[in-house]
């Protein structure tokens, strides 16, 4: 249901933070987030997201810290508008982009058009941690 809430928020131009917390983001100059102060967000099943700019109003980018547990299942492919950037902090990630699997390791990054089917999954025996920045 939280995935549906995310899409409803986008459709009606309401910030997801306002729906989840009941308070509209108010910051418009800068938003400093200290360690442990991120807001958890459920965007797609199987992904653990932490919103790194939850209180910034009218954002054009969504910076998220993502943690994926090891998994042997193929990534669920999704499409959305905008542009997307992924930067791997720890572990290894397989980005499925259309019919191609692209491996990214710590320190690797990729910038791509998310209107094409894509999905990420952890590659290996340890969780993968990466930053994604989504502009929609």
Model-derived regions: residue spans:
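Short, conserved beta-strand element in jelly-roll/cupin
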Residues: 67-68, 78-95
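Short acidic-glycine-tyrosine-enriched beta hairpin
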Residues: 52, 98-114
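Conserved small/polar residues in nucleotide/adenosyl-binding loops
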Residues: 1-4
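Short amphipathic recognition helices of helix-turn-helix/homeodomain-type DNA-binding modules
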Residues: 18-28
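Ligand-binding loop in jelly-roll beta-barrel domains
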Residues: 47-48, 59, 105-106, 114-136
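A short glycine-rich, His/Asp/Glu-containing loop-to-beta-strand
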Residues: 38-76, 133-136
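The alpha-helix within a helix-turn-helix
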Residues: 9
